Amino acid sequence: MTNYKRIGHIAIRAKDIDASIAFYRDLLGMEEAFRMYNEAGRLSTIYVCLAPGQFIEIFPDGLVERKIDTDTIGYSHLCIEVEDAAKTLETLRAGGLLVDRELQTGLSRCRMFWTHDPDGNRIEFMELTPESLQAQAIKRLEAL
């Protein structure tokens, strides 16, 4: 077994850092953890906290747009696990969240809905139901 603890952060480069912070901090409700500045005093990175010890690292000044869809090779999406997908959807939608795919039960029997950030990065919100394959795998792996 490895000594991995968790995914510490994901990193994205934003075209408009203010729009990204408004999305992740103000709309999704993540706490801004800290900002880093380079030697010239210019903003280089903003960290927002998703959950204890888990961050999204946002870099400003993205210049090159890329096609982001289900067929793109490489990074596909961020999945945020939530306690209650329906309640989360209702709360975020009331705050102005645009939903790409409505709440549904996936092949793995989890409940999920989808959105995207200001740069088009896909985000899945997922609730693990007791019968979901993920919840079953977690139980099995914790028993090892």
Role assignments for model-derived ranges:
Residues 2, 13-55:
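Core segments of cupin and vicinal oxygen chelate
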Residues 57-59, 124:
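Conserved beta-strand in the GNAT
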Residues 1-3, 6-15, 45-50, 66-144, ...:
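Vicinal oxygen chelate
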Residues 33-35, 43, 63-68, 101, ...:
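A short, acidic/glycine-rich surface segment
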